[in-house]
């Protein structure tokens, strides 16, 4: 029997991967209830960009998620905090998303602090890291993590979309979509070809992602829009609970 692909392999292979938002203080029973509403969910998501960040709470949620064998997606607080990615990963998330990514410097710094040596420079430590209980040996764990964890960069402006070929690099698994801030940016640049509509910008980004070898992640929120964005080329989705 073929081995089931892990999270990173699944995303890299273009297998549709669907996440669902959960409260940052969700209990085990709450997470179980949300996951029970749709058997298509592959990960849960919490956000700190627009919500308070309480690290012990994030750690507790990650521990519960590990008990349920469900990966945690975590959007970090700010673009300029990429240097803290390793610290947050030590708490237990499996997926990191960097908001408002615009530059190659941000993309590379995210890669550097996401991966262990020799590919990155993430520091060793963290008692609740995902998978650490099964892999206490340093070389075993670091090799495993570098082939398991998922790194996403969020594009939220026309310039960021144009920059996707420069943001995409080894170690970046997906480009995620930021429709709200992008909408504001489109309004400021009404004559740019990508300002026509969100769908027009998505279609452009989908092609660029395909050409550069990264996957496209869309926050569709409403599960009824799932197929629409899959048809547009997104292979990773994030939804509100049903």
What is the predicted function of each stretch?
Residues 11-29, 73-78, 149-162, 215-222:
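Active-site mouth loops of central-metabolism enzymes
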Residues 55-81, 112-124, 140-147, 193-218:
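Alpha-helix-loop-beta-strand connector modules within alpha/beta enzyme cores
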Residues 95-171, 179-184:
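Conserved anion-binding
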Residues 122-133, 149-162, 192, 197-242:
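C-terminal alpha-helical cap/extension of soluble enzyme domains
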Residues 1-21, 135-147, 204, 211:
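N-terminal amphipathic alpha-helix/helix-capping segment at the start of soluble metabolic enzymes
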Residues 1-72, 79, 169:
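Conserved N-terminal beta1-alpha1 strand-loop-helix module at the mouth
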Residues 31-37, 74, 79-94, 98, ...:
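Catalytic cores of alpha/beta
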Residues 15-19, 42-43, 69-73, 94-97, ...:
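Structural preference for beta-strand elements that scaffold enzyme active sites
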